[in-house]
Amino acid sequence: MPEELALQISNAFPKKEAMVLKKSLREYKYVAAQMDQYNPLLEQVIYAFQDERIVKLVGEICSIENPEPDENLYAGGISLMAEGNFLNPHLDNSHDKNRNKWRVLNLLYYVTPNWEDSYGGHLEVWPKGLDNEPITIYSRFNRLTVMATHQKSWHSVSPVTHNGERCCVSNYYFSDTPLTNEDQFHVTSFRARPGQKIKDVILQTDAFLRMGVRKVFKKGITENPHVYKKDKEE
């Protein structure tokens, strides 16, 4: 985007105290999806990535037929990571909130100016599995990263080591069919980083138990709150 617009988006981000804190063994970050609570520019840029022309172009670049954006922002919206924040290696939930569509693409638009590579908070992808080194995709200002989501698309965010805030606008695209023939339904499943054996056992057990719940209750016991409830004003 034009740098001036990207700066406006960055300046429109709310304080982390006005966002939802997600802090556990799995992750430590701030997120928001109820976009009518924030600067209107943020909602505008999120849905700009859902414009039919943009969705079609991204689908063509990624060789995906008929991708569909998610107006509900299920796990999408905005996120902020401050010093000490992190996101452990994980697989994104395989479906949309109603389990009708397959999640196929993750769009991450980074808007923090002057975010140095040494600050951390970067996307890491693990194409050769968690026993091998990840590939780092730096969260540089005004950069859009598009990542495939499937049964083996392990990814993480490196710990933020800088006294600052890395801001991101995120979207997911869905499809009637999965990206690979191996794909099966799964909840968001976390693992630990290499060498963290005890943490890894805990996180794998956590994912196993949550999968067990979803086998009985298709949409889970409680509704995932991370969606944009547009009828809230009605």
What are these regions (language model features)?
Residues Y47, P67-D70, S79-L80, D96-K101:
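Short, conserved, surface-exposed binding loops centered on an aromatic residue
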Residues E65-A75, Y119:
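A short coil-to-beta-strand element that immediately follows conserved catalytic motifs
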Residues L25-Y28, L73-L80:
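Short, glycine/charge-rich beta-strand/loop segments that flank catalytic centers
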Residues F13-E17, R53, C62-N66, Y109, ...:
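A generic secondary-structure signal for well-formed alpha-helical elements
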Residues H95-R103, T112-E234:
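Catalytic core of Fe(II)/2-oxoglutarate
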